[in-house]
């Protein structure tokens, strides 16, 4: 038995399959500081506790794009490790804010499969949902990717 995760191939997916991604992630001050430093983001809501409180938050929420990247990354080993390309994203929403100290987890459901005419790959459609430690949905999106098959014709 190999300890290397080979990821899922097109044939490994089935419509309705629910994937609980194994790793949770607690958002740290370091995550937020590095994100702001690397991106140059200066949205006042995400950079200032005072402004966040003036806008009705107890503390500053993290940037939604950072939330997307932290949560989306949880799905890579299970869904897109064998992707030829991520083809698209749709219906992205951030229903609830995420704060430093929150722990997020991710589940994905396969909602569609379409074998490509080349016989070497197929498109996998998934609906992914990220939740915080209280079960509140913090990220909801659909994506589709071109995924390799185990055997190429």
Regions found by a protein language model. Name each.
Residues 1-15, 98-103, 107-153:
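HotDog/MaoC-like acyl-thioester-processing domains
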Residues 82-87, 91-100:
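Mid-chain, well-packed structural core segment of small domains
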Residues 1-88, 150-153:
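Hot-dog-fold acyl-thioester-processing enzymes
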